[in-house]
Amino acid sequence: MDGVSSLPNELLCHILSFLTTKEAALTSILSKRWRNLIAFVPNLYIDDTVFLHPEEGKRDRPEIIQSFMDFVDRILALQGNYPIKKCSLKCLTEVDSVRVDAWISNVLARGVTDLDLLIILDCESDDNYRLSPKCLQSSTLVSLKIDGGIDIARVDNFDILLLALPALEELALVDVIWKDEDDYPLVNMKNLFDARIIFMLQLPGAREPDDDHWFDQNVALRYSNVWKLFLGLQNVPNLYLSPDTLKVLSLYCESMPVFKNLKSLAIKSGKERGWQAIPVLLRNCPHLETLVIEGVLHNVTDKCGDACDCISREDKGRSLTSCPVKMLEIRGFRGTMKEMTMMKHFLDYFLCLKAMNIYVEENDPTELRFPEVSKCIMQMMEEYNKLSSCNVELLVTDYFYFSEKWTAKGRIL
């Protein structure tokens, strides 16, 4: 008997839970001992791209698709009412939507806590999978991801959907079809732990002008009710905002809610987007502890606000001085003097700051590849640490001139 087969069933099922459901099912041919273990695997990874033959055209044959659906039916029937923790369902072929409904209902009835759906019935048409509200009624579901053009237009009230999921903490909606794409739901997502808000806007030119008129009337109208979405997120402890999301927020700063429970805020900046929304955002986070900024370089406008050092103003840094943030992470650092000026600005005006971690850009070349620049940056960091009680650290990887972690106090960690 080999060492693996001598393991207890519970441990074998745990090992199988890391495989795709097809791979786990194939182990049944090893011996009688393995034949029914698939019935007790707590995780399901059902992916028709893994099950179906990858050869061109073969996967679209009706008999192949039918065999995939029959396989899923057999697995679910074999498992019966055995509890399930996680289910990932990926269907990119013309499977029967009625059977998809049944599969989703099956795992929900068995107490699934993590559900990931990617369903595209027909890639060449607008025939989207229509998610029935009856398929999303669960007292155990904690994490839900809906992806791939799934139509939730039949869900008349989004708040009703969330009320049917009282334990939900993580919700991701990617490329879904809404009943009214110009409106946003006003719901209280009080259990939500982590929110990532990513809007995608189309600029009329390469860069935005210095005023807000670059939005045409139709686009502005589309986001006129966005405040309702953020009002429902005001209790979230962790929030991530994309560059376009910051731009949308800048149009409706007066409606921005107070995020009274927010502890960690992550912002991705962009050279084509300004920082108009950041001052109000920081003032509306009274208990913020960690701030992450990915890319401090941004588009400078006359309404950039007092959060940056781009334009001289009397109220410079006012929103920073009132912010209680203790940890600041800067990501995507390129080693430019403009970035270093921003670091000094943060050190001067974030009065509660205890630590600043600066992560060097890893995907593109930076100025740090030049020895004279890296030496200058180290000297400036050294000076910053002398002038501030905040501990400034530069974290880099795969750079010849730096160790894995260097502190401005001159220590190699």
Swiss-Prot record:
Looking at the UniProt entry, the stretches that span the membrane are none
Q: SMART domains annotated for this entry?
A: FBD, FBOX
Annotated SUPFAM superfamilies = F-box domain (SSF81383)
The record's section on CDD domains has: F-box_AtFBL13-like
Q: Where is the F-box domain?
A: 1-48
Q: What is this protein called?
A: Putative F-box protein At3g58820
